[in-house]
Amino acid sequence: MQSSIIEITNIKKKIVYQTQITLLLVLELNNIHLEYQCRSGYCGICRIELIKGEVFYLIKQPMAALFKEREIFPCCCKPKGNITIKI
């Protein structure tokens, strides 16, 4: 399995990602806690900024209304290679 690096700019932390779980769960397992509610892309509470890289969604498209360009929903996405985020 190929690994990716998740860099979190505002807390100066890097995480090695080698699994098939969501970005939100990876962050939680590394003691980085985000606000969330639905874990399925409907509420939009967990949204964070994607500074660099790409993610893919496990659902067709998050349902949360009016998300901005470069905002992602870690509850229902996974990194496509290395990413840089701001939480």
Curated annotation (Swiss-Prot):
It comes from the Bacteria. Keywords: 2Fe-2S, Electron transport, Iron, Iron-sulfur, Metal-binding, Transport. Residues 4-87 form the 2Fe-2S ferredoxin-type domain. Binds 1 [2Fe-2S] cluster. Gene3D superfamilies: 3.10.20.30. One of its GO terms (molecular function) is 2 iron, 2 sulfur cluster binding. InterPro entries: 2Fe-2S_ferredoxin-like_sf, 2Fe-2S_ferredoxin-type, 2Fe2S_fd_BS, Beta-grasp_dom_sf. [2Fe-2S] cluster binds at residues 38, 43, 46, 75. PROSITE patterns: 2FE2S_FER_1. The keyword Phosphoprotein does not apply. Its cofactor is [2Fe-2S] cluster. This is Uncharacterized ferredoxin-like protein BU177.
